[in-house]
């Protein structure tokens, strides 16, 4: 029998028509991205610290976490976005590590954290780095606030070099009645614009996204040169309109140098790790959906059509088809370059393993336009 069946046994003798239904070629689902909110615990809250719960709106947050940072963050996040699933966990005595341990293996694509002390930043960076690695692949991007003078923000930027952490630089922000916003409220509005945009299209730039309900009351805004320096130090920036409304300018990651200490812009914008996560998940979903129980044969093997067998060239063809599809969606570019560099081969030491090396080129955002006008008379 050439066709590989999963349910109909080869030794069946009872008369009948037995037809399997296989959905392995039909998966086109997009992953539902989730947000985790982390804030300080308050006395008397219904939900104990280090307990993750679904928390979809401000009222739910107040019932579960009282008048806390978490409630404030839900309020301002929901001013920006109404649909992203939100979970929350509270931290007791600044012990963020214990709260992170409570997450288990559940993936949260975006993490909104009001705590920004050195220990939290370090613990969160280590946690995110581990979840980004190949053996876990449950990554996320964290958004943290920092309010201060320009000099204080520049100094703070050196606290982390994690490509999965994005700091928001805060000057003086308020609500529509000019009531000062807390850092938690400000960064929630920031993440409320950034996270849903990345979920919808990880490559699309984020400048000019308006933070609803947020206004500047600063007597002096950071000028171009100050914001440019902040961006070089791993601190994200915003701009202020003539009506004092606040817009996202450029959310960058904290990653500014490589292991050798040399300046490195490979993870400059948050779109880059977001796109890398998206691309990897697409590849994993493809292989697991189509070839979850296939046999593996070397190139040139002659096998009957319908057999659940895969070869390196079949895998390569599927990866190329996926890349072409993602190119059409505006996620990647240079298909011919990708095709030339893609290597798919059997492992020399483990014949049940296939290895591949590819070099995708992600589509970038249009962030800077430079021109030179040479006029004539």
Say what each PLM segment does.
Residues 1-377:
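Surface-exposed assembly/interface segments
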């Amino acid at each position: 029998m050439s066709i590989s069946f999963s349910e109909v046994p080869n030794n069946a003798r009872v008369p009948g028509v037995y037809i399997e239904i296989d959905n392995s070629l039909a998966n086109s689902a997009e992953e539902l991205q989730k947000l985790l909110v982390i804030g300080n615990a308050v006395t008397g809250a219904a939900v104990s610290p280090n307990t993750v719960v679904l928390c979809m709106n401000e009222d739910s947050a107040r019932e579960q976490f009282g008048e806390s940072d978490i409630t404030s963050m839900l309020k301002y996040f929901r001013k920006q976005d109404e649909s992203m699933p939100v979970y929350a966990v509270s931290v007791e005595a600044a012990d963020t590590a214990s709260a992170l341990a409570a997450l288990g293996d559940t993936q949260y694509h975006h993490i909104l954290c009001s705590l920004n002390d050195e220990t939290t930043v370090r613990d969160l960076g280590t946690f995110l780095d581990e979840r980004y690695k190949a053996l876990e692949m449950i990554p996320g991007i964290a958004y943290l606030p920092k309010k201060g003078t320009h000099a204080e923000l520049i100094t703070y930027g050196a606290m982390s070099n994690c490509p999965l952490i994005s700091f928001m630089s805060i000057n003086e922000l308020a609500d529509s009645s000019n009531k000062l916003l807390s850092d938690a409220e400000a960064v929630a509005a920031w993440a409320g614009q950034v996270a849903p945009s990345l979920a919808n299209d990880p490559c699309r730039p984020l400048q000019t996204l308006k933070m609803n309900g947020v206004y500047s009351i600063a007597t002096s805004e950071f000028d171009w040169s100050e914001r440019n320096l902040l961006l070089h130090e791993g601190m994200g920036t915003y701009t202020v309109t003539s009506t004092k409304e606040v817009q996202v300018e450029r959310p960058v990651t904290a990653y500014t140098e490589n292991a050798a200490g040399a300046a490195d812009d490979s993870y400059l914008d948050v779109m880059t790790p977001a796109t890398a996560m998206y691309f990897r998940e697409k590849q994993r979903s493809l292989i697991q959906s189509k070839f979850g129980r296939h046999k593996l044969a070397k190139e040139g093997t002659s096998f009957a059509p319908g057999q659940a067998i895969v070869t390196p060239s079949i895998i390569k063809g599927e990866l190329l088809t996926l890349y072409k599809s993602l190119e059409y969606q505006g996620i990647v570019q240079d298909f011919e370059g990708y095709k030339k560099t893609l290597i798919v081969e059997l492992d020399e030491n483990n014949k049940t393993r296939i290895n591949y090396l590819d070099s995708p080129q992600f589509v970038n955002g249009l962030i800077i336009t430079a021109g030179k006008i040479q006029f004539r008379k």
